[in-house]
């Protein structure tokens, strides 16, 4: 029954050992970086080789913060065709589009995890006590580059020139999960 399955998922989640959690987070970060490499390869960015090498340096729990180092390089390169250096500024349409796309993914992941009986506030790496979606925020990481690629396509390749999220941009971002 559904209640038994939920209890099994809960018990499993609560019984995970630190070594397993560390290795799991390492795999999540590795998959995220590998997908970021694919985005940069798609955009013919030569720096994807350096980004790819970061996956070789990963340790359990990402104790050396390779995710942070790779993110600095990734964000520097992904929108390098722009006249200005891209920052995750709240007024930047690319950033608004990324956040919108991530919110779509997060809600789908959170719903799927909840339906399987997992406790969302019990994350693998994310541990914020005020965040009810720590686990979803962990699981989303390897999927973020799919949103990044769509935003890259819209604003860098197609040259969409909007200042605000339009209905068409929102539709495109929603289509990622189709």
State where each predicted segment sits.
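Catalytic nucleotidyl-transfer cores of nucleotide-processing enzymes
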Residues: 1
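Active-site helix-to-loop segments that bind/position phosphate- or nucleotide-bearing substrates
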Residues: 5-178
């Amino acid at each position: 029954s559904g209640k038994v399955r939920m209890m099994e998922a809960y018990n499993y989640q609560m019984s995970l050992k630190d070594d397993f959690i560390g290795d799991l987070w390492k795999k999540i970060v590795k998959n995220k970086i590998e997908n970021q490499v694919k985005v940069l390869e798609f955009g013919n960015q030569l720096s994807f080789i350096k980004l790819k090498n970061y996956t070789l340096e990963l340790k359990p729990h990402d104790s050396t913060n390779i995710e942070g180092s790779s993110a600095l390089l990734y964000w520097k390169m992904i929108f390098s065709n722009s006249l200005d250096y891209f920052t995750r500024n709240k007024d930047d349409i690319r950033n608004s589009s990324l956040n919108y796309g991530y919110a779509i993914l997060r809600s789908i992941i959170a719903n799927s995890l909840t339906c399987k009986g997992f406790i969302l506030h019990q994350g693998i790496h994310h541990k914020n006590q005020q965040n009810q979606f720590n686990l979803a925020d962990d699981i989303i990481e390897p999927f973020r580059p799919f949103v990044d690629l769509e935003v890259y396509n819209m604003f860098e390749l197609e040259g969409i020139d909007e200042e605000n999220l339009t209905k068409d941009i929102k539709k495109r971002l929603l289509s990622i999960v189709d």
